[in-house]
Amino acid sequence: MASNDKGLEEIPDNQIESNYDEITDSFDAMNLRAELLRGVYAYGFERPSAIQQRAIMPVIKGSDVIAQAQSGTGKTATFSISALQKVDTNLKACQALILAPTRELAQQIQKVVVAIGDFMSVECHACIGGTNVREDIKALNDGPQVVVGTPGRVHDMIQRRVLKTDQMKMFVLDEADEMLSRGFTEQIYDIFQFLPQSTQVVLLSATMPQDVLDVTTKFMRDPVRILVKKAELTLEGIKQFYIAVEKEEWKLDTLSDLYETVTITQAVIFCNTRRKVDWLTDKLIARDFTVSAMHGEMEQNQRDVIMKEFRSGSSRVLIATDLLARGIDVQQVSLVINYDLPANRENYIHRIGRGGRFGRKGVAINFVTADDVRMMREIEQFYSTQIEEMPMNVADLI
């Protein structure tokens, strides 16, 4: 087993033991169809997360796969990308069936499949309770290649022979522990009986209670087992402030002023788009600041050089998109500036949870316009934390 996954050594009882640790660390190396790869990048993915690096390839190769992973690890895209790689777009029939415990999750998955499959002529239908049965029947008769649904409605549609299973290649159970604990066991077992023997089974679950293990032993053949631990990031020890900026256009001056007051050992400045990163970099260079920039459109070797310079301290300020927010430890970062608040709140901890890692203290400063106030409140609530107005003596804190 590769030694880079230290988390695999101590495994509590309800965790599976990983039997697979091959890693594919870029989407380019996965041999995806060109139009699917285009969709992956257009969706905003830069590089695969830990689960995507491990699980996409065995799924594409046709193995049954059990992945133990929490939400927030990138699991939805893992099976969405795999399913889209495997379906025959010329065949109007359900080839991949994805089950989820709730309607909301099923709809969310459908959105991801549709978005990533944007450049492919692929149909994805959400087959969920609480919607019009007749419309469901009509949509299923069109033969969408991917169907996402909740167990009750999917079971009903299979029994009515509306959702035909004869062309099924892949069956995905997302949040299997949730589905089984909600009493869907019988329906799920039933659905298995309708599928062709050759159907590949992919099961994702945060925990591995007995009822989930039963499904894996009854219905899966020699599965690849992948355990992905979610890195525990914390906001402890990180002072979080905001600066109220009246207009978006004034953020640049605010940043310049901040530079004047603060001696920065090293800082990361986050923007939400690649374009903004380039724009801000140019503006700061024009004002004689030394900065480097990093985003997903750069070649990997270019990124590596920039990271090396930043790690060694020869470059002091790095402007980046969320690409940097996951999986890169820069120990000496004392300051993180959110020039833009993250578009989704999960990324907040990935951006600033790093500044204070290894017990180091850190400071995070958020630039907040009137439009951002709601998002900031949501972030505070989500993490049960306080983001306070930046005090005058901020220089003493960094």
UniProtKB/Swiss-Prot annotation:
SUPFAM superfamilies: P-loop containing nucleoside triphosphate hydrolases
Superkingdom of this protein's organism: Eukaryota
Catalytic activity: ATP + H2O = ADP + phosphate + H(+)
Motif (DEAD box): 174-177
Signal peptide positions (record): none
Record keywords, A-Z: ATP-binding, Cytoplasm, Helicase, Hydrolase, Initiation factor, Nucleotide-binding, Protein biosynthesis, RNA-binding
UniProt-annotated binding residues for ATP: A69, Q70, S71, G72, T73, G74, K75, T76
Primary localization class, coarse: cytoplasm
EC category: hydrolase
One Pfam family it belongs to: Helicase_C
Molecular function, one GO term: ATP hydrolysis activity
Enzyme Commission number(s): 3.6.4.13
Family, as annotated: Belongs to the DEAD box helicase family. eIF4A subfamily.
Biological role stated in the UniProt entry: ATP-dependent RNA helicase which is a subunit of the eIF4F complex involved in cap recognition and is required for mRNA binding to ribosome. In the current model of translation initiation, eIF4A unwinds RNA secondary structures in the 5'-UTR of mRNAs which is necessary to allow efficient binding of the small ribosomal subunit, and subsequent scanning for the initiator codon.
Subunit architecture: Component of the eIF4F complex, which composition varies with external and internal environmental conditions. It is composed of at least eIF4A, eIF4E and eIF4G.
Protein name as annotated: ATP-dependent RNA helicase eIF4A
Taxonomic path: Eukaryota, Fungi, Dikarya, Ascomycota, Pezizomycotina
Gene: TIF1
